[in-house]
């Protein structure tokens, strides 16, 4: 893997960690992170009460190239849904679920977080 890919992956993991901390400060509890399935990857899996929340974290340094939410396309949503179904099946879970998206803008330590609960429907 090239250095730029390693740097991008490292930055992505850092933003996911920061988003998990931010969401925890808003009452969610981390269950799992970076879950891979054949159809995609789930950045964060958290609990909001009895609801299992699959969370996509998107980061942009600034809005010059669009808002982070704009990168969650219909194709990306389908991959997330497939990965979530695999996760539920693999873990024998049957519970209320939702898909959230967290947009992170800026560079540390000046980050702005935006959170869309129930960003799209799946089940």
Swiss-Prot record:
Q: Which GO terms describe its molecular function?
A: nucleic acid binding
Q: Name one Pfam family in it.
A: UPF0102
Q: Which InterPro entries match?
A: Restrct_endonuc-II-like (IPR011335), tRNA_endonuc-like_dom_sf (IPR011856), UPF0102_YraN-like (IPR003509)
Superkingdom is: Bacteria
Q: Hey, which family's this protein in? A: Belongs to the UPF0102 family.
Q: Which NCBIfam families match?
A: PRK12497.1-3 (NF009150), YraN family protein (TIGR00252)
Q: Could you identify this protein by its name?
A: UPF0102 protein Csal_2201
Source organism (scientific name): Chromohalobacter salexigens (strain ATCC BAA-138 / DSM 3043 / CIP 106854 / NCIMB 13768 / 1H11)
